[in-house]
UniProtKB/Swiss-Prot annotation:
SUPFAM superfamilies: Glucocorticoid receptor-like (DNA-binding domain) (SSF57716). It comes from Marinomonas sp. (strain MWYL1). InterPro entries: Ribosomal_uS14, Ribosomal_uS14_bac/plastid, Ribosomal_uS14_CS. The gene is rpsN. Belongs to the universal ribosomal protein uS14 family. The keyword RNA-binding applies. This is Small ribosomal subunit protein uS14. The lineage of its organism: Bacteria, Pseudomonadati, Pseudomonadota, Gammaproteobacteria, Oceanospirillales. Binds 16S rRNA, required for the assembly of 30S particles and may also be responsible for determining the conformation of the 16S rRNA at the A site.
């Protein structure tokens, strides 16, 4: 089980990403705009750098919803490989069964 502080830190990052998503998208649009002047692009770059570091979506980590484990997490289920296997063996995941050939 992951430390509670790590899970809370990840939740904080998720909130920050949601809070600054529109602002980041607008600034990135200005930076990548061909028609924008160099001064506008430079100011947008400085404003983007001034935003909180954790407001970037690339700083988020997929974690297991049950244990908080950061590695081996299946996006489709939101569970780590260990908990997904346990749930599949119990029959809790509809349509998922053990492979046999």
């Amino acid at each position: 089980m992951a430390k509670v502080s790590m899970i809370q830190r990840e939740a904080k990052r998720t909130k920050l990403v949601a809070k600054f998503a529109e602002k980041r998208a607008a600034l990135k649009a200005i930076i990548s705009d061909v028609n924008a002047s160099d001064d506008e692009k430079w100011e947008a770059t400085l404003k983007l750098q001034a935003l909180p570091r954790d407001s970037s979506s690339s700083r988020q980590r997929n974690r297991c919803q049950i244990t908080g484990r950061p590695h081996g997490v299946y996006r489709r289920f939101g569970l780590s490989r260990i908990k997904l296997r346990e749930a599949a063996m119990r029959g809790d995941v509809p349509g998922l069964k053990k492979a046999s050939w």
